[in-house]
Amino acid sequence: MRRVHPLKFACLALLLTAPLTAFAVGKCDRVIATGAADNPPFLWRDPENPKRLIGASADLLKAITDSLGLKLEVLYTGGPSKALEEVRSGRVDLLLDATLDVEKLAVLDFVHPPVAPLQTVAWVRHEPGFLYAGRDDLAGLRGLVVKGDSFTDAGLQLRTAPDLAQATRSLLKQEADYVLHERYSAVARLGGQGLLDEVQRLEPPVASREMHLAVAHDSACNDPWLRGQLAIKMTELRAAGVPRQLLSENLLRWRDQQSKPAKTP
């Protein structure tokens, strides 16, 4: 039987003792959320129900909505741009993986504190001798990023690879000196493909940004009460270390799913 960390139970119990005032105070009794569908351990499609998203971000929001007496649906809507469009339109209430920028501020109310930092880190071959104290030590070396990754840096020599697995194999063949990729995403992907033990992560990160919950301006559920409750609950959960615990649990969940044979139609 899988052991569940007692910290999670304690924190969720604390949340569930909050008064269930949602029906009396809020505008709605159901929240619909979405996000990028291919970003484990934060979010990915449920293999048992592909119309639904699962992952650490979904689990975190479920803990919050349960404590507020709200129903929650976390739906698959497509890739990052499609998910944002569905939230922007108000057809979906909440974006689970919003990063702060001017364009999104025009259509979303960001919840503070953030869910987690998204750290772009350098991954190198698991061998001694790579001297690294920061981003400047990568100058002049051959780097790889995954196609579609938003990271750019004019001071680094970066080529694109179709996916993280191919980038990592190029690294292991010494066709590149490092790969840049988000920390948790790389652990999930490489762990599921059996490549994680072949590489090592360099610290400090090359870049970092925050991932937030964000409520659509045009959502029927968007009101001061809900925004305030989301901020309060996020503050409590962050202080208790729950987001990090959920990330660890969902890394294992993703890896377990990858080890199972695919179902035949």
Residue ranges and their predicted role:
Residues 17-22:
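N-terminal signal peptide c-region/cleavage motif recognized by signal peptidases
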Residues 36-38, 117-121, 193-234, 253-262:
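Periplasmic-binding protein-like
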Residues 55-67, 127-129, 147-149, 214-254:
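Extended ligand-binding regions for polar small-molecule ligands
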Residues 66, 76, 81-93, 165-188, ...:
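Short helices/loops that flank or line small-molecule/ion binding pockets
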Residues 98-107, 178-208:
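A ligand-binding cleft/hinge motif common to bilobed small-molecule-binding domains
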